[in-house]
């Protein structure tokens, strides 16, 4: 039987080349080449460790390290020839290394498999991505604090069911988003801890017979811990799923914020104005100024939710250890990280530039009987049970709807028709300022509480 040499580095067992379509179908280099820097970083650490344990000579290590550094320079200069027939980022770099330094390049993979190599690359890459995303969250939170401080006294309607509920300050509303982003930050920090565990040394699935010292590569690569089981090390993608879950929550928060910004910029609300640089126009309607940034972020949240669902579905049927299915982990992970990072960047740039229309907000807060709860609380302080007060104020509101008057616009005689406990001091309660100032406790909407919350927020950010 004649044997035709295969076209792969693993071709010894095979008698014919991989089908051309199959080679393209199974190749991942088009998307995993973005891991090149982390792949080279891992390879340099691996070669350094192999030299320390005597598997490589110092001269071989130096040749490998120098060759890898030159390859990185080629890639970053745009002169590297990525080949689909070499499947992935790992084999492209290894083949080029062998071209550059000869047979020594073939020794780099000693004691290592692409299974633990790619698991290491992804963790190194995601670790850096999380750091970048955390910095963007902090930048957005700083912008929210600055705007909240400037608008601590600006009164707007607070909503439930998108109906006017109670007056709040715009600063207080903005700080709600600060709190949500704080939880996102904490989740990603926690995720970072589990990302930062080293699988390198797990080899294909069972470890290696070479006298490796994983502590060396762990220290060189800055991992916090070494993975304790080689089977789990090569097959675990929990960290990617966890990141996409945290990213989904963050994008959900940005999507909710986006929805409010879209509403607030509309002609029906007109609460805020976004600078032109964050908006676009219409190809047919000359008057249009569309809030495309928040609209697009709202839409992009679905991509990240899809990445989470995709990874969960990808992993749910896999037996131990590594399976080719896991090649499909990268594109959703990459896309989720890119989408979250860019969405945060867009918001961090845009939020400090928001221009509130204070008088429009205030006028909106005056409508819809927003101080009705304050009137009920006033009657409670007069000694009436809250449920009775609730009913009394409900009757007053109905009268206001029928007569076209807000509670604060009614005369004392009109108000006393509903309870003789109402005196002239009620009008201090029914003002917008009286309503927000009365909620003077930690987490409340009173302007001084908003300023205190801003101070606490800045202290928190300074400690990061």
UniProtKB/Swiss-Prot annotation:
Belongs to the lyase 1 family. Argininosuccinate lyase subfamily. It is found in: Cytoplasm. CDD domains: Argininosuccinate_lyase (cd01359). PANTHER family: ARGININOSUCCINATE LYASE. Keywords: Amino-acid biosynthesis, Arginine biosynthesis, Cytoplasm, Lyase. Pathway: Amino-acid biosynthesis; L-arginine biosynthesis; L-arginine from L-ornithine and carbamoyl phosphate: step 3/3. This is Argininosuccinate lyase.
């Amino acid at each position: 039987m004649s044997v035709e040499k295969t076209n792969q580095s693993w071709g010894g067992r095979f008698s014919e080349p991989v089908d051309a379509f199959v080679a393209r179908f199974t190749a991942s280099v088009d998307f995993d080449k973005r891991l090149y820097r982390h792949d080279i970083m891992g390879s340099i650490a691996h070669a350094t460790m192999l030299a320390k344990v005597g598997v490589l000579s110092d001269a071989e290590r130096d040749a490998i390290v120098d060759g890898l550094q030159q390859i990185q320079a080629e890639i970053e200069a745009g002169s590297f020839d990525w080949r689909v027939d070499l499947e992935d980022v790992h084999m492209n770099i290894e083949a080029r290394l062998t071209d550059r330094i000869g047979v020594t390049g073939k020794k780099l993979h000693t004691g290592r498999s692409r299974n633990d190599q790619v698991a290491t690359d992804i963790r190194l890459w995601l670790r850096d991505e999380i750091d970048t995303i955390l910095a963007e969250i902090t930048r957005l939170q700083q912008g929210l604090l600055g705007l909240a401080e400037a608008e601590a006294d600006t009164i707007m309607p607070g909503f439930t069911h998108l109906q006017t509920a109670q007056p709040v300050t715009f600063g207080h509303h903005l700080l709600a988003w600060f709190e949500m982003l704080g939880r996102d930050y904490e989740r990603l920090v926690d995720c970072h801890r589990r990302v930062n565990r080293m699988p390198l040394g797990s080899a294909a699935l069972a470890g290696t017979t070479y006298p490796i010292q994983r502590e060396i590569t762990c220290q060189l690569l800055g991992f916090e811990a070494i993975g304790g089981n080689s089977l789990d090390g090569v097959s675990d993608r929990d960290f990617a799923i966890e990141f996409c879950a945290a990213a989904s929550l963050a994008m959900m928060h940005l999507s909710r914020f986006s929805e409010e910004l879209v509403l607030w910029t509309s002609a029906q609300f007109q609460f805020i104005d976004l600078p032109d640089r964050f908006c676009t126009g219409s190809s047919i309607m000359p008057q249009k100024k569309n809030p495309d940034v928040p609209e697009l972020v709202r839409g992009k949240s679905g991509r990240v939710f899809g990445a989470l669902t995709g990874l969960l579905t990808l992993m749910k049927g896999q037996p131990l250890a590594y399976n080719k299915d896991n090649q499909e982990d990268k594109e959703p992970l990459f896309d989720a990280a890119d989408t979250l990072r860019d969405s945060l960047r867009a918001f961090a740039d845009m939020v400090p530039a928001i221009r509130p229309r204070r008088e429009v907000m205030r006028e909106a807060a005056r409508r819809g009987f927003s101080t009705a709860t304050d009137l009920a609380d006033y009657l409670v302080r007069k000694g009436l049970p809250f449920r009775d007060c609730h009913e009394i104020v409900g009757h007053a509101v109905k009268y206001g709807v029928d007569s076209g008057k807000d509670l604060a616009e009614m005369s004392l005689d009109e108000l006393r028709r509903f309870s003789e406990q109402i005196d002239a001091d009620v009008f201090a309660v029914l003002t917008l300022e009286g309503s927000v100032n009365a909620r003077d406790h930690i987490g409340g909407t009173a302007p001084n509480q908003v300023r205190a919350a801003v101070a606490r927020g800045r202290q928190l950010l300074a400690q990061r």
